[in-house]
Amino acid sequence: MAGNTIGQLFRVTTFGESHGLALGGIVDGVPPGIPLTEADLQHDLDRRRPGTSRYTTQRREPDQVKILSGVFDGVTTGTSIGLLIENTDQRSQDYSAIKDVFRPGHADYTYEQKYGLRDYRGGGRSSARETAMRVAAGAIAKKYLAEKFGIEIRGCLTQMGDIPLEIKDWRQVELNPFFCPDADKLDALDELMRALKKEGDSIGAKVTVMASGVPAGLGEPVFDRLDADIAHALMSINAVKGVEIGEGFNVVALRGSQNRDEITAQGFQSNHAGGILGGISSGQHIVAHMALKPTSSITVPGRTINRMGEEVEMITKGRHDPCVGIRAVPIAEAMLAIVLMDHLLRHRAQNADVKTEIPRW
C-alpha cells in the first residue's frame, strides 16, 4: 500500500489502523538541536482527541504519544523521530454486523475493490483515527516554525451546516468545544448538534486554517506550487471534499479589478490570493478553507449491498461524530504546518543565498 508518506525534505510517514494495537509515525528531516519533549506534542493531540466533548465521538482514547527515537537529552538529533500512540478503547464488536456489508458513503466498497479485502473494524486504515499521528508530526513542525521563524498557524470552524461563523475573535476558538471564533453562534451550534443526535443524523462543515509570518518565496513551481501542495495535504484528510485558497470559488463572481491584490509602498492592499501568487508565498497571511462532508456513520437506515451483491438495509452502530469538522481543526493546522516546514527547508536548500532589493512587509 503506497501513499503513506508526505513531504520531500520534511517527510512524515504514518502507519496503523483504527482498531489495531497502535498508530505510528516516522518523521524525517527535523533539524538537530531543537528542544522537543512528548509534552510539546500532547497539547495538539488533546485538542483532536476523541471523547472530550458531548458533541464528538465518545470513544475515549488518551492518545498519549511516545517518542521512540530521534531525541536525546531533550533535543532532536537530526535522525528519524519515531512516534507511537497506543489504541486503548476499541470496541470491535460494534462492527461485526458490517463484516460482509458495505457502509454507504464509506471507503468499505472501494478498499475491497482495490485490495480484495478490508479491515471492517472502524474502517481500518481509512479511519480518521490515523490523523492522530499527523497531528503529532504537525506539532513538531509548528514548534519549529514558531520558534525559528515566528510563523503562527491557527484554524477554526467557519461554517456548520447552514450556520456561517465569522472570525470575530481568535481567542474564542480555544474557549469552546466547536473551535468557533464567533461566540454569538454557540447556542445555535449547540441546538443543531442536539437535534442531529436526536435524529441520528450528521452535518457537514467548513474549516479555515491560516498561517501568519510566512516569508515570501516559499513554493516550487510548477508542479510543487505552495498552494498545490497545501491543497494536496488538506484533501488527504478524511471527509474533505473541497479546498479553497484565499477567495477560492468566490473569485468566479469577481472582476479582475476587484480580485487583484494591489500593491502600494505600504504593502498589499488586500489578500484575495490567500498569501500565494504564482505558487509562491507573498509574505501575506496564507489562508485556506476546506469543506468536510457529513459523516455517513449515522443511525438513519440506508440502502446498500453485501458481498453477494444483495440489497440490504443497514444502520451504522458504534461511536461517531455528528460533525467531523469540529475535530478537523487541529488536523488542518498540522497538515499546513507539515507543508510549510517542508517548503521552508526546500527553499533554504536552494535559495539561501538569494538577495533582493524588493520591499517586504
Curated annotation (Swiss-Prot):
What's the stated role of this polypeptide? This reaction introduces a second double bond into the aromatic ring system.
* A Pfam family the protein falls into: Chorismate_synt
Upper classification of the organism = Bacteria, Pseudomonadati, Pseudomonadota, Gammaproteobacteria, Enterobacterales
Cofactor(s) this protein cannot do without? FMNH2
Q: Which NCBIfam families match?
A: aroC (TIGR00033), PRK05382.1 (NF003793)
Instruction: Share what the entry says about its subunit structure, partners included.
Output: Homotetramer.
Q: What is this protein called?
A: Chorismate synthase
Among CDD domains, the record links this protein to: Chorismate_synthase
**Record keyword Metal-binding present:** no
EC number of this enzyme: 4.2.3.5
- Enumerate the UniProt keywords alphabetically: Amino-acid biosynthesis, Aromatic amino acid biosynthesis, FAD, Flavoprotein, FMN, Lyase, NADP
Q: How is the cofactor bound?
A: Reduced FMN (FMNH(2)).
- What organism is this sequence from? Salmonella typhi
A GO cellular component annotation here is: cytosol
* Gene it is expressed from: aroC
